[in-house]
């Protein structure tokens, strides 16, 4: 007789009938893949039941190893073993060499300034290395799910910029994966905890992984996840703990490993093992390169306490941006393997005044959240229960006359978002316009970050102010920016997708925000001055054109008075007092009132010449 399958209410009895989707946590140190099976999110293990896949790739002449085997080969063949490639994603070669001068790899520049790494398999770039890691994760998912994936959600640090996000998408495509969405890592963790606990209120997500730190302040209310503010440091993580401890071990053992990458790898492995031991024990035994010794938890904590304090400074800035205090935070979610370090949990608990949440494995929580989101996006589950809102970290705008910045999308605006503003031409007969896209909080172009420039050509040759150009800024769910400019009367259009050639660190973002606050008053004054100077230039240029056409309408005395008022305005423009410039503009306007009226009369007479009253 036929067997009847029975499942729990709300769970699927036949998961193979669902569309196959996966969430991927593409980490700096380790990566994971997860999926939703029978209604529950779970990470997928390899044949040895290991959930984590080290984000390490070893390149040989005829073979590529990914994961644990590659990690084991790192000490023997460091030049051909690429690890922590996530730190290189979207960065220029010059930037990488400056940030990480001790990397053992043989770099070669490419035509676009991006890094290429010489290996036994040939030249590879960070996108290709990331693709090899994604291929291994995808293969694990296919084997576990017994089928091809319909789509994946891949997580990225909250402060990954456009180039880094695009590089991640390119790596996924190279791995043969369909990307449903890129998802911020802290937001993925919020999804995992929010769905499990139904918590409402303000939540802090403290994500300290191998190579990046992110802090996100979120508000969860009735299934809505809203990111109030983000912060962090894209060059700070557990890897830095490991390197500090490895340096300490080298000094204690009296080992000079600076030119021996194999010994350096052994020191690093010993440091990692000691760090893991010290999460549960007060003392760890260490044996490396013929040296044996011990390190206490107290000694380890003294090495890393300054780095932990740096993360708390970022937490303080994020709370200020969100407009909330630590007392208003209901729960603190801990994400990332480095949050297992007792000092981290202790310091974070003291800062927020409550014991952090660790009920979901901090190594797995991001992948689990990504899997839940992938399951929704692939169509297995209605998304009416949950709305996900991310934010952009810095304001986006464009340059206007006088070197001013007109903000189109303010900082911390929820994405995806589209905003448009209308602009016009400054000169008579202007047939082209340069659109200069900027990022930052300051009032002047020179103080903001330039993202891109493009030209809108073919404008109708109208008088100044006659053409109307609509500029639309659109940020998609992955944080990628598209800018489109269109002249309304002709439909002439130009657009660009912003992909910076290198990343912007969290420290730089924090400094840009801090500078905008520190210079707020002086920036407002500089903006007022520039605005009056632009208006003065417009008035003078317009008046000079009018005088060239109709100077005969003025008496000699009137011409002299106008010339003197123009000279006075030009003199004030050289100064720094916007009020004086404004007064000079008004004085010139008063001198030209009669002239303007006569020009209007003359224009009407010319228009009526040769026409009868009936025709009018």
From Swiss-Prot:
The record's HAMAP family line, in alphabetical order, gives:
HscA
Q: Which gene specifies this protein's sequence?
A: hscA
- Known function: Chaperone involved in the maturation of iron-sulfur cluster-containing proteins. Has a low intrinsic ATPase activity which is markedly stimulated by HscB. Involved in the maturation of IscU.
Q: Which Gene3D superfamilies match?
A: 1.20.1270.10, 3.30.420.40, Actin, Chain A, domain 4 (3.90.640.10), Substrate Binding Domain Of DNAk, Chain A, domain 1 (2.60.34.10)
Alphabetically sorted, this entry's keywords are:
ATP-binding, Chaperone, Nucleotide-binding
* Keyword Chaperone tagged: yes
Gene Ontology MF terms in the entry: ATP binding; ATP hydrolysis activity; ATP-dependent protein folding chaperone; unfolded protein binding
GO:BP terms for this protein?
Answer: iron-sulfur cluster assembly
What name does the UniProt record give this protein? Chaperone protein HscA
Recorded coiled-coil stretches:
none
Alphabetical list of PANTHER family matching this protein? HEAT SHOCK PROTEIN 70KDA
Q: Which family does it belong to?
A: Belongs to the heat shock protein 70 family.
Pfam families named among the record's database cross-references: HSP70
């Amino acid at each position: 007789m036929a067997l009847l399958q029975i499942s729990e209410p709300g769970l699927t009895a036949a998961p193979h009938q669902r569309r196959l989707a996966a969430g991927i946590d593409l980490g700096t140190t380790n990566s994971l893949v997860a999926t939703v099976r029978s209604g529950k999110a779970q990470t997928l293990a390899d044949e040895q039941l290991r959930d984590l896949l080290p984000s390490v790739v070893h390149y040989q002449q005829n073979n590529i190893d990914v994961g644990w085997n590659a990690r084991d080969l790192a000490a023997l063949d460091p030049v051909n073993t690429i690890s922590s490639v996530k730190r290189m994603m979207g960065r220029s070669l010059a930037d990488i060499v400056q940030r990480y001068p001790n990397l053992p790899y043989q770099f070669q520049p490419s035509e676009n300034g991006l890094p290429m790494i010489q290996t036994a398999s040939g030249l590879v770039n960070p996108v290709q290395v990331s693709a090899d890691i994604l291929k291994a994760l995808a293969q694990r998912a296919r084997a576990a799910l017994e089928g091809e994936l319909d789509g994946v959600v891949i997580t990225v640090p909250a402060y990954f910029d456009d180039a880094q996000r695009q590089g991640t998408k390119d790596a996924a495509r190279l791995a043969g994966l369909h990307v449903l969405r890129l998802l911020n890592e802290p937001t993925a963790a919020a999804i995992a905890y929010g769905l499990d606990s139904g918590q409402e209120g303000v939540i802090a997500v403290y994500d300290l992984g191998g190579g990046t730190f992110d802090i996100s302040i979120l508000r969860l209310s009735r299934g809505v996840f809203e990111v109030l503010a983000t912060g962090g440091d894209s060059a700070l993580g557990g890897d830095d703990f490991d390197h500090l401890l490895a340096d300490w071990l080298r000094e204690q053992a009296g080992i000079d490993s600076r030119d021996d990458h194999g010994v350096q790898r052994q020191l690093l492995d010993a440091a990692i093992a000691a760090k893991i031991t010290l999460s549960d024990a007060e003392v760890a035994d260490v044996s490396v390169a013929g040296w044996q010794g011990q390190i206490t938890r107290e000694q380890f904590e003294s090495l890393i306490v300054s780095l932990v304090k740096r993360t708390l400074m970022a937490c303080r800035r994020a709370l200020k941006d969100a407009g909330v205090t630590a007392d208003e935070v209901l729960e603190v979610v801990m994400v990332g393997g480095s949050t297992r370090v007792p000092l981290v949990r202790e310091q974070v608990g003291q800062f927020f005044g409550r014991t952090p949440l660790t009920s979901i494995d901090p190594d797995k929580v991001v992948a689990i959240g990504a899997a839940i989101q992938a399951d929704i996006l692939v169509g297995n589950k209605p998304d009416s229960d949950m709305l996900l809102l991310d934010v952009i970290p810095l304001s986006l705008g464009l340059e206007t006359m006088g070197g001013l910045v007109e903000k189109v999308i303010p900082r911390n605006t929820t994405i995806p978002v589209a905003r448009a503003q209308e602009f016009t031409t400054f000169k008579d007969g202007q047939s082209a316009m340069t659109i200069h896209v900027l990022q930052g909080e300051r009032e002047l172009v020179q103080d903001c970050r330039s993202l891109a420039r493009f030209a809108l050509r073919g404008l109708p040759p109208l008088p100044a102010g006659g053409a109307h150009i609509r500029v639309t800024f659109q940020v998609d769910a992955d944080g990628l920016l598209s800018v489109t400019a269109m002249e309304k009367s002709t439909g002439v259009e130009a657009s660009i997708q912003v992909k910076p050639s290198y990343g912007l660190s969290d420290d730089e973002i924090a400094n840009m925000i801090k500078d905008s606050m520190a210079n707020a008053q002086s920036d407002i004054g500089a903006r007022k001055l520039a605005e009056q100077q632009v208006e003065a230039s417009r008035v003078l240029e317009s008046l000079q054109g009018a005088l060239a056409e109709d100077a005969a309408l003025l008496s000699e005395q009137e011409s002299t008075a106008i010339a003197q008022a123009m000279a006075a305005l030009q003199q004030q423009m050289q100064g720094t007092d916007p009020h004086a410039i404004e007064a000079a503009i008004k004085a010139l306007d008063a001198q030209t009132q009669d002239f303007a009226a006569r020009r209007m009369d003359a224009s009407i007479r010319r228009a009526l010449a040769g026409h009868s009253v009936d025709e009018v």
